[in-house]
Curated annotation (Swiss-Prot):
Major localization listed first in the record, in broad terms: secreted
Organism whose genome encodes this protein: Octodon degus (Degu)
Protein name: Insulin
InterPro entries: Insulin, Insulin-like, Insulin-like_sf, Insulin_CS, Insulin_family
Gene: INS
Function: Insulin decreases blood glucose concentration. It increases cell permeability to monosaccharides, amino acids and fatty acids. It accelerates glycolysis, the pentose phosphate cycle, and glycogen synthesis in liver.
Length: 109
């Protein structure tokens, strides 16, 4: 391998391992094992959670409607429900997500 190719490879690796490596994740689509790796790096030891399945969320929304909780506008948990229903795959694989959006999926220590 030519010396300049070797140098280019080393520089590319250093750029990925540098202090802005977390920001590199936020500027690309994260799918499959790349998404899982990004979550492990973002959440650290606290780990990350898997949102409830869609049926559980729909049941919760029906219960809220029956109790009249939707009449007063969005409830405090509305954003959380929207995030869970939308899902991390939609946020980070189909679209580009930020570091802060990844942190929303971390367990609270």
């Amino acid at each position: 391998m030519a010396p300049w190719m070797h140098l280019l490879t080393v520089l590319a690796l250093l750029a990925l391992w540098g202090p802005n490596s977390v920001q590199a994740y936020s500027s690309q689509h994260l799918c499959g094992s790349n998404l899982v790796e990004a979550l492990y790096m973002t959440c650290g030891r606290s780990g990350f959670y898997r949102p409830h399945d869609r049926r559980e969320l729909e049941d919760l929304q029906v219960e809220q409607a029956e109790l009249g909780l939707e009449a007063g506008g969005l409830q405090p948990s509305a954003l959380e429900m929207i995030l869970q229903k939308r899902g991390i795959v939609d946020q980070c694989c189909n679209n580009i997500c930020t570091f802060n959006q990844l942190q929303n999926y971390c367990n609270v220590p």
